[in-house]
A protein has these predicted regions:
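Beta-strand-centric surfaces of beta-sandwich/beta-rich domains
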Residues: 1-29, 35-132
């Protein structure tokens, strides 16, 4: 069950029109949880979004910003094959670079959807027993 760890450092005066982008390789599976650590000192001046291709997946709209907090997103986002996510950030701070730390929990489908796979296994057992 891969825990993907990544971070992005955004230089001071990085405009939204020309953001910093960091690509993160992720295995096929289901993204079930995302943690974003915003260190103290950001003063809500640095901003982050996570994209899959052109689609923004975290957050669904707006952007992540804050100061000295950890955000946790319970997610269900399927990646049918090994793929790449993009951390995209900009920084309105005129003096300091700012960094976001990101963790992604990617589960194989049987672990992400245990109820579905349990029912399928039960159906197979009943079928073998001649019970439908």
């Amino acid at each position: 069950m891969p825990l993907i760890c990544a971070d992005i450092t955004i230089p001071a005066n990085t405009p939204q029109t020309s953001p910093v982008r960091v690509q993160v390789k992720v295995p096929a599976g289901v993204i079930r949880k995302v943690w974003v650590l915003i260190p103290y000192g950001h003063k809500a001046l640095a901003h982050l979004v996570i994209r899959h291709g052109e689609t923004q997946i975290i957050p669904w709209y707006g952007d992540i910003h804050g100061d000295g907090e950890q955000l946790v997103f319970d997610e269900v986002y399927e990646l049918p094959t090994d793929d790449v996510l993009t951390l995209e950030g900009w920084n309105e701070d005129t003096v300091y670079d700012n960094r976001f730390i990101v963790r992604l929990l990617v589960l194989p489908k049987p672990y992400a959807y245990p109820e579905i796979y349990s029912l399928q296994a039960l159906r197979k057992v009943l079928e073998v027993m001649g019970i439908e």
